[in-house]
């Protein structure tokens, strides 16, 4: 890692894929090691999580190192629970994830405001108005939201054929109109 980054002024390390918090000790070791090894450089960390298993210890640790945390939350309960279930028991995820979001916001409000983001997935044919309304009604600004458009033909993101591209353009236009309403 050092050899690869020795000539850059800033090092960015990302944790994502599956659920990175399942191996929190490894994440903590990487952050501790990297901040010591690169003490003369700026080191930034970011992570994408489903938000279901974050603990108070993790929240405080990530706040200490200003980890940019992106939580996969699709919006209100009826949207989140439609496709996001716990693998082990098939139960819905919204209540657990949303309670953890509120815990993060209350426990580390400054870090939450500056470093916590949301990554909702929007299915084909859906206009994300309910998702935006949910976030807005919970005092989450649109600049903290990064929407992903899912492709139901598989697990891939949008395939760029004419039909899907037009759906994507239409959805983005509707979203812009929605966000610019008074």
Where does each model-flagged region fall?
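Catalytic alpha/beta active-site cores
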Residues: 1-2, 10, 56-57
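Generic structural signal for well-ordered alpha-helical scaffold segments
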Residues: 2-3, 35, 102-105
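Aromatic-lined, polymer-binding surfaces characteristic
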Residues: 2-6, 69
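Short helix-terminating capping/connector loops at secondary-structure junctions
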Residues: 5-10, 38-43, 110-115, 141
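Active-site groove signature of glycoside hydrolases
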Residues: 8-20
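Canonical radical SAM enzyme core domain
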Residues: 20-82, 86-96, 120-130, 151-154
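Radical SAM enzyme [4Fe-4S]-AdoMet core and its adjacent flexible, acidic
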Residues: 78-98, 102-182
